[in-house]
Amino acid sequence: MVSLGGIARKLFGSANERRVRSYKSKIAAINALEEATKALSDEALAAKTAEFRQQLADGKTLDDLLIPAFAVAREASRRVLHMRPFDVQLTGAMILHGGAIAEMKTGEGKTLVATLAVYLNALAGKGVHVVTVNDYLAKRDAATMSKLYGFLGLTTGVIVHGLDDDQRREAYACDITYATNNELGFDYLRDNMKYDRAQMVQRGHNYAIVDEVDSILVDEARTPLIISGPLDDRSDLYNTIDAFIPLLSPEDYEIDEKQRSANFSEDGTEKLENLLRQAGLLKGESLYDIENVAIVHHINNALKAHKLFTRDKDYIVRNDEIVIIDEFTGRMMPGRRYSEGQHQALEAKEKVQIQPENQTLSSVTFQNYFRMYEKLAGMTGTASTEAEEFGNIYGLDVIEVPTNLPIQRIDEDDEVYRTGEEKFLAIITEIKAAHERGQPVLVGTTSIEKSELLAHMLRQSGFTDFQVLNARYHEQEAYIVSQAGVPGAVTIATNMAGRGTDIQLGGNVDMRLERELEGMEPGPELDAKEAAIRAEIKVLKEKALAAGGLYVIATERHESRRIDNQLRGRSGRQGDPGRSKFYLSLQDDLMRIFGSERMDSMLQKLGLKDGEAIVHPWINKALERAQKKVEARNFETRKNLLKYDDVLNDQRKVIFDQRLELMEADNIGETAADMRHEVIEALVTKHIPENAYAEQWDIAGLKAGIAQFLNLDLPVEEWAKEEGIAEDDILQRVTEAADTYAAERAERFGPEIMTYVERSVILQTIDHLWREHIVNLDHLRSVVGFRGYAQRDPLQEYKAEAFELFQSLLTNLREAVTAQLMRVELVQQEPQQPELPEMTAHHLDPVTGEDEMAQGVPAAFVPAEERDPNNPATWGRIGRNEMCPCGSGKKYKHCHGVYEQA
């Protein structure tokens, strides 16, 4: 029976179809300009950019220029790149310009689509960011497309790992900047730790087009970007708290092995409060008062170290160090450390040397970074399954763009086996059969370990003609993936490997030409070689087509339907034939999630023998339902995390905006005076309560406060004895005395130096307090979940207490700045910019947990063991705070680094 919704869709088309149809009139208008645009000379075509910019200056909008600008960009693409965007690609570009997500299938030319929207938006001169998932793709796309943009008179920059600030600033100043999501986020964080506007590298967040938008804004968004630096040594605190845990009895705490959590009972909390009070570590009455957030965090870590972490199972002690053992592989992981002080708690437990913990200096999630752009758009082959998330979190619509040619790929029903071994044996049989008939095969796995296991089983079966590909070496993997369409090729790859590279039947022409013609001089020999490669690929493509096109074999279903669709979408590009099939077992992760035991007994009743598979559309539907449940759960988790991060984000925006204002302001004196006046008012209000008698005034406290914060010795006692004196009179006299003293100092220093001093003091104090605040919020977040047991909403509690902590930060800021400015003395020397702290960037891969930034080595970095102390030429780039390689024992900046500065 056809539903009413189905009848309506047949009559009027779906919302997506109506949206796509709405672009038809504009496409017709662009096509109508094609002949006239073709008739222009190269110079006249390039001159259109200046003409468009003038029209914008005269009041036209980008929307007004869309039709002529797209016509110009299309013609320039035809001349420079020898590619003419199809009508469906114009549709995709209009979706991007409109600030939405264009879902375009693999092979539909997303990179080319972006150029049209990029060109139009770059005309405004505010910068366009094209965001990719790795350095290789950023460099590749920038190198290819800069020819097109350069022809049209626009500049292109690229941001990858290892660039210095000057190179980054130059790249961001270009009309168009290609960059990875990680580099953009870290540059934003680093910029907001600088002390001078001229030191910053980014110039705003105008318009971004995110390639592989689902990967960056959904998958990668589960883990934040963090910049950390070393903290002060707190070994004594860890050792003191560690000594408390053995004094507790089993009734004092509750352990949940499954959830890996440890909590204190009421008796345990009481016992700890007494111990902490004796040690002078407890503030206030209760352990769970807001002032004790950090102590609670340390105590919880100590309890986990003793009761949840087992020596020689979770970690070993080697060479006076704690070395983590991977719970899945059983391998040691030297160099990896638990975060949030947990590693230090283990070091205290085992009585080894406690290494200083790293402090988060700054952090941001991708959700909050990308929401800063005035306009955001994205492209991917698979976004519709996450449409709700894109709409809710980013305000982005997902619009499916029709393919240029109909999809001919056959998606077969899943085959389900009882065990993983049976499944892999069936896959090996299928791979060999496809290889025999010359059909290219791409085998998708969910992890590097599964890839290695299948490769091992293939070799054992006597088959060695295959490539294994893991998402680690982007340039090498791009080449292997590009050749996976050669007849008979067998490529085993993790789902995420080779993103951004098309698998073309017969092989990728461009990749082969680039690799095989490298270093050849232009001439007849090069032309002949190029013609031979093109002819060979044409023959190979015909063979691959005759064998049925690319065959995608998936070894497991992923938690997300989107990842499965990505893998399927590798086959059947641009109307080519292809096949896809999923091989599953009841031991797969997803099957276990939704009750494989029940299914196992059911399959046995059906008489399923070893090595046999069940194939039925019902299985596919059941799996899809399970995937939808998991997707919904993951979305809820991300949404919940974002609610907490939004609290920090609102505060981050206030602090970063304040910093920017201070850096750009010509005169800071007014800000400093406002802070001073608020401190004075708070002091007087605290020690002289409203409507209190003179006998109730705390004159001694007021005098001490004035000395502490204002560096003044005022005759407050005499003032208090005067007949009819009121609190307002005291406030006025203290304010006048402080203002006079501050004015004298400003006159002595001179306006220029005073402004510099005020700016430096305020910025450095903000940074110091903000770092402490981030740590406090981290600690608060780690314990606030327990409020749920008391029937209180943890999120509301977190918001309220985070606000209290922020108010406290602002009070501390005013007091610290005032106290410092009223004491600072001028030493005759050239003012120097405050040094930035040592910084390390981290972004954990949400799937593997590996630190993506740990693999990058800064440009020109030389390992210490390869440096010759007597030959500075062998030292490479050296951090200013590193020990000098010459062996003097001094920091580089105080030794050989002095010559660089001179």
Curated annotation (Swiss-Prot):
Pfam (any one): SecA_SW
InterPro entries: Helicase_ATP-bd, Helicase_C-like, P-loop_NTPase, SEC_C_motif, SecA, SecA_CS, SecA_DEAD, SecA_motor_DEAD
Matching SMART domains: SecA_DEAD, SecA_PP_bind
A GO biological-process term: protein transport by the Sec complex
Binding positions (ATP): 89, 107-111, 502
Protein EC: 7.4.2.8
Segments crossing the lipid bilayer: none
Localization terms from the record: Cell inner membrane; Cytoplasm
EC class: translocase
This protein's record includes keyword S-adenosyl-L-methionine: no
Record field: catalytic activity: ATP + H2O + cellular proteinSide 1 = ADP + phosphate + cellular proteinSide 2
Cysteines engaged in disulfide bonds, as pairs: none
Keywords assigned by UniProt, alphabetized: ATP-binding, Cell inner membrane, Cell membrane, Cytoplasm, Membrane, Metal-binding, Nucleotide-binding, Protein transport, Translocase, Translocation, Transport, Zinc
Cofactor note: May bind 1 zinc ion per subunit.
A single MF term (Gene Ontology): protein-exporting ATPase activity
Cofactor: Zn(2+)
List of residues binding Zn(2+): 884, 886, 895-896
Membrane topology designation: Peripheral membrane protein
GO cellular component: cell envelope Sec protein transport complex; cytosol; plasma membrane; type II protein secretion system complex
Listed PANTHER family: CHLOROPLAST PROTEIN-TRANSPORTING ATPASE, SECA INNER MEMBRANE COMPONENT OF SEC PROTEIN SECRETION SYSTEM
Matches recorded under HAMAP family: SecA
Summary of the function given for this chain in its UniProt record: Part of the Sec protein translocase complex. Interacts with the SecYEG preprotein conducting channel. Has a central role in coupling the hydrolysis of ATP to the transfer of proteins into and across the cell membrane, serving both as a receptor for the preprotein-SecB complex and as an ATP-driven molecular motor driving the stepwise translocation of polypeptide chains across the membrane.
Self-association state and partner proteins as the record states: Monomer and homodimer. Part of the essential Sec protein translocation apparatus which comprises SecA, SecYEG and auxiliary proteins SecDF-YajC and YidC.
Protein family per UniProt: Belongs to the SecA family.
Record protein name field: Protein translocase subunit SecA
Native species: Agrobacterium fabrum (strain C58 / ATCC 33970)
Gene that this sequence comes from: secA
